[in-house]
Each structure stands twice: as structure tokens, then as C-alpha cells.
A protein has these predicted regions:
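Non-catalytic terminal extensions of PLP-dependent enzymes
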Residues: 1-16, 121-123, 186-187, 195, ...
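PLP-dependent aminotransferase-class I/II
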Residues: 3-70
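Structural detector of well-ordered beta-strand residues that form the stable sheet scaffold
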Residues: 19, 101-103, 132, 239, ...
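Flexible glycine/proline-rich, aromatic-decorated loop/lid segments
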Residues: 108, 116-126, 152-179, 282-314
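Conserved active-site segment immediately N-terminal to the catalytic lysine
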Residues: 102-104, 108, 116-139, 146-150
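Active-site C-terminal subdomain of aminotransferase-like
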Residues: 136-227
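Buried hydrophobic positions in well-ordered alpha/beta secondary-structure cores of metabolic enzymes
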Residues: 28, 32, 55, 71, ...
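Active-site phosphate-binding strand-loop segment of PLP-dependent enzymes
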Residues: 38-40, 50-106, 138
Length: 438
């Protein structure tokens, strides 16, 4: 830790301070924690968004006077889809001389990004100093390169590049070197990922071609319908503020069974996959600190979970199931996802006896699962005889959706008439941490 090499008093006076939000992705929190900067977290307000009053109080705190101050916030939560008031946060940070940086990974595919909006009044500065985007959430984005955009005024040319290597220099002598003056080139060490960069550019073009108005309208309609219908199901607990106007189309939820006990989040994802072919994500979505708040996990309980994980019991980690309602979905497909989640919340507990739980990994495996997995190789790809892919008509898709839902209900009805599987409770401290039925 380089901080140990510095005098504590000197460090306290000169150490940069980074204000981070209450719903950061790990990439916008752990990277700051591991730097020489001090990180200070801004609270949630009553509406589940960044508390601007608390942020202003921190900016006025004399402990942070005469130190470089940076605000680094998610433009939206990748867990609940909650959108940050980027303009208000930027204006507030600049009012006190701090830099305004935003992680746009969760919402860049769906919203406009304006780094230089018009000021609302004289002296207002709502500009953004830097944004960072991982475009993997864009349509066609997986495998594209990350994007960093920043205002030239915050770049210190007197310092060497972030990574000094090939491609960053104009000339290298026997004992010294001259770095390239052009910022973008001097910050691209080594051989660039050309295809990945081209792919990143193309996915932004797709977004622009469709238009954020179209994207926002479609996703808002899907989100409104999902939240409205799931609110009628007492077994579903949607995380975060349920107001669809405050969100992008990302929804995380948990499910309780008839006895009030939770179904494990990874069990939910397995049922959605096995019964309906719907891919969802289970876990904490790389947002552990936010998860503590959403799930009301206090520090002593958190330490107990940490101890269990260190002992190899990763399956005990709390979390949620996350689904996305994307703008490319038509109403039939969005309704299918909504209906499938409702089914799992209503009938999922009947399927517990069909699955084995691995406490070490949290994996749920069907007891009759078996057979060889499909081969992943060039030979297998070239040998396929599946023919050309075809687009299914709306009528055929609706027919298939109804069929899958009916088949799932038929299985649930059969299981309901069979003797209930005996539920298992872990012993000792592990039992105290067991929040789910199995």
C-alpha cells in the first residue's frame, strides 16, 4: 500500500478525495479504494437516488479543503435502473471546484449523453469532466472496447502517460524519451484493439440510428407494465424505487414462497432458464455495498456472511435476480418475460425437490440433468446441419410462449399433488445465515 509510505499528516492534507455514489458498480468503487485517494460515499435519499443535500454537505466539509476533489457517480444503477440527476450533480460539484465524472455503463445504451449542456443560469456549470463506458450492454456490444471521454482541461501533460510503453512515444534515446503530445495516442499503449474499437463505434451508431426517444418510449412501456403486474403478486419484492419514471429498463427482484421464506436468487434464474429459456442474472450484480442497503444487511451480519464465504460456502451470499426489458422486445416477448416471472414467483417453490443445491457455489442442478454438453470447436461449427437461421413470426412466437407457460403449469400441478419434498435447514451459524428454502 503506497499510502503506508507517506506521512499520515501529509497524506491527510494532500490526499485526493473521491465522492462516490450509493449504488456504484464495483468497477467505480474498488478502483478508487485501491488508489491513493480517500473515498467518501454519498447517501441515498428518500427516493432511492443520490442525496444532493448530503453531497453538498460533504463538499463544504473543511476536512476536504485544499485537496483535489472528484465526484465519480453512476449515471444509473445497474441493479435497480435508478437514474441519477447527472446535470444537478455536475453543477453542484463544479460549484465547489470538484471534478464531475460519471460511469455510464448501465444506461449509455438507452439515454442521451451530453457532456456540455447549456447552463441554466449565469455561473452554472453542468458540464461533465469525464465519462467512462463499457459498451457490453449495447445491442451488439459484447466484445467491444471500453470508452473513456474526458475534457482536455483536466489532463496534465507534464506527467507521463498512464502506461508508458510502445505507441506512446515520439522518440526514445539511450536514457530518456519524448512522449507523444496528442493525448489520445499517448494514452493508447501497445497494439490497439482495432476490431474492438470499430465494434464500439458501430454499436453507438446503432443507438443513434434508432434514436433515444424510440428506445426510451419502448423501455418505459415495458417497465411500466412489468412493475404494475408484479406489484399484484405478493410473492415478488422489486428492489428500489418502483417509480418507472426514475428507471431505465433494469429490474431486480426477490421471491418469497408461501411460508414467507425466500427462494434462492440462483434458483430463480435456473427456473426461468429451464422452463422458459429466459436468461437472467443472479447475484449482487457487482454492486455489493448497494446490496447491503437494498437487503438491509448490517455490519455484524455482513461479517458473518464474509466468514461463511471464506470457509467456502459462497452459496450463502445474498443477492437477487435481475432481468432486462429491452427495447428490441415487442409486447409479446416482454409479456412472456413478465408472465414467466409471475409463474416462478407463484409456483417456483413446488420445483425445489427437483433440484440439488451446491453450498460451495450456489449452483442449482436438476437431478435428472445429464448427457454430453454440446461441443465448442471449429469442427462442430462447420459440421452443423441446422441450416440458415429463420425469424419466427409473431403468431408462432405467441403460440410457443403459451405452450411453454402451459407446460410449466402442468408440471407445477403434478408436483402440487405429490408429497412435498422435505426442506433442509443448515445447522449452527450457517443455519442462521440461510435465508432461502431448499
Amino acid at each position: 500500500n503506497l499510502g503506508d509510505l507517506l506521512d499520515e499528516d501529509v497524506l491527510a492534507e494532500t490526499q485526493p478525495v473521491v465522492f462516490i455514489g450509493p449504488y456504484e458498480h464495483h468497477s467505480n468503487e474498488l478502483s478508487w479504494r485501491q488508489s491513493l485517494a480517500e473515498t467518501v460515499q454519498v447517501r441515498l435519499d428518500a427516493g432511492g437516488q443520490i442525496d444532493l443535500g448530503h453531497l453538498e454537505a460533504l463538499l463544504q466539509d473543511p476536512r476536504y479543503d485544499n485537496r483535489m476533489r472528484i465526484g465519480s457517480f453512476s449515471a444509473a444503477s445497474n441493479v435497480t435502473g435508478m437514474r441519477s440527476d447527472v446535470r444537478a450533480i455536475s453543477s453542484l460539484l463544479h460549484k465547489y471546484g470538484a471534478l464531475a465524472c460519471f460511469d455510464y455503463a448501465a444506461c449509455a445504451p438507452y439515454v442521451d449523453i451530453d457532456m456540455n449542456p447549456e447552463p441554466a443560469f449565469e455561473g452554472d456549470d453542468p458540464s461533465i469532466d469525464a465519462i467512462f463506458v463499457s459498451p457490453h450492454k449495447f445491442l451488439g456490444g459484447p466484445g467491444s472496447s471500453g470508452v473513456l471521454v474526458f475534457n482536455e482541461r483536466i489532463y496534465d501533460r507534464s506527467l507521463p502517460p498512464s502506461v508508458s510503453a510502445g505507441g506512446t512515444v515520439d522518440y526514445v534515446g539511450m536514457t530518456d524519451q519524448d512522449f507523444i503530445g496528442r493525448i489520445e495516442e499517448r494514452e493508447k499503449a501497445g497494439t490497439p484493439g482495432v476490431l474492438q474499437t470499430l465494434k464500439a463505434g458501430l454499436v453507438f451508431q446503432i443507438k443513434d440510428a434508432v434514436g433515444t426517444d424510440v428506445i426510451a418510449t419502448r423501455e418505459h412501456a415495458h417497465t411500466c407494465r412489468a412493475l404494475s403486474r408484479w406489484a399484484e403478486n405478493d410473492n415478488i419484492e422489486v428492489l428500489g424505487n418502483p417509480d418507472p419514471c426514475s428507471r431505465v429498463g433494469i429490474i431486480s427482484f426477490n421471491v418469497r414462497d408461501e411460508s414467507g421464506r425466500y427462494l434462492h436468487h440462483k434458483f430463480l434464474t435456473v427456473l426461468l432458464n429451464d422452463l422458459f429459456g429466459i436468461q437472467s442474472r443472479a447475484g449482487c450484480s457487482c454492486a455489493g455495498p448497494y446490496g447491503h442497503r437494498l437487503l438491509n444487511i448490517d455490519e455484524p451480519t455482513s461479517e458473518k456472511y464474509r466468514s461463511a464465504v471464506k470457509q467456502g460456502h459462497c452459496g450463502l451470499k445474498p443477492g437477487w435476480c435481475r432481468v432486462g426489458l429491452h427495447w428490441v422486445m415487442d409486447d409479446a416477448e416482454a409479456d412472456y418475460v413478465i408472465d414467466a416471472v409471475n409463474f416462478v414467483a407463484r409456483e417456483g417453490h413446488h420445483f425445489l425437490g427437483l433440484y440439488d443445491f451446491d453450498l460451495a457455489t450456489g449452483t442449482w442442478s436438476h437431478r435428472n440433468a445429464g448427457g454430453d454438453l454440446p461441443e465448442f470447436s471449429l469442427d462442430a461449427a462447420l459440421a452443423t446441419d441446422e441450416g440458415e437461421p429463420a425469424t419466427l413470426s409473431l403468431q408462432l412466437r405467441q403460440q410457443l410462449y403459451r405452450h411453454y407457460l402451459a407446460e410449466a403449469q402442468k408440471i407445477a400441478d403434478q408436483l402440487r399433488n405429490e408429497p412435498d419434498a422435505k426442506l433442509v435447514s443448515l445447522e449452527g451459524e450457517l443455519g442462521d445465515l440461510q435465508f432461502f428454502a431448499m
